A protein has these predicted regions:
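GST superfamily/GST-like fold recognition
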Residues: 108-109, 154-161
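Short histidine-centered beta-strand/loop micro-motifs
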Residues: 82-85, 153-157
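Hydrophobic alpha-helical bundle segments that form small-molecule/ligand-binding pockets
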Residues: 143-155
Length: 161
């Protein structure tokens, strides 16, 4: 098994942290997006979207998307439980996982895409969209601060993904 990784990616970082918290030893293969390594025929055969992270199993099966990779690793290595201990815990973890992706991560990625140098020749950048999205992200961060107030963890009583 090996993990194809883009070190600065928050999604790849989520998987690396998950692996570390599980105490797993999975070799990491860094992929350089800046040089187009993720667009080679070999990589696209593993993940047709060319994104990271990607977990390649020993039999050649490939799992993309950080949530799916974490789910697989949790099922194969249930201790310590990082996706919840029972049905209610798992539902709460899933709820917060989804909220973080939709309310914070995707908007932050949009800001990066519409302002980042590496994207200027790949997409039509709309700086005004980035400005408005930045305001929305700031509001969501304030919301998150209120949700975290007085809690050790956002998704229940135990440490989770």
């Amino acid at each position: 098994m090996k993990l194809y990784d883009l070190p600065p990616s928050p999604n790849a970082r989520r998987v690396r942290i998950f692996i570390a918290e599980k105490g797993l030893d999975i070799p990491v293969v860094p992929v350089n997006m800046m040089t187009g390594e993720n667009q080679t025929d070999d990589y696209l055969a593993k993940n047709s979207l060319g994104k990271m992270p990607l977990l390649e199993l020993d039999d050649g099966t490939c799992i993309a998307e950080s949530a799916a990779i974490c789910r697989y690793l949790e099922e194969m290595n249930p201790d310590p439980p990082l996706l919840g201990r029972d049905a209610l815990d798992r539902a709460i973890v899933d709820m917060w996982h989804r909220r973080m992706e939709l309310e914070l991560l995707l908007p932050m990625i949009s800001i990066f895409v519409h302002t980042g140098e590496m994207w200027k020749d790949r997409v039509t950048q709309i700086p005004q969209l980035a400005e408005e999205t930045t305001k929305n992200v700031k509001a969501r961060m304030e919301w998150l601060d209120k949700e975290l107030d007085g809690k050790e963890f956002i998704a229940g009583e135990n440490y989770t993904v």
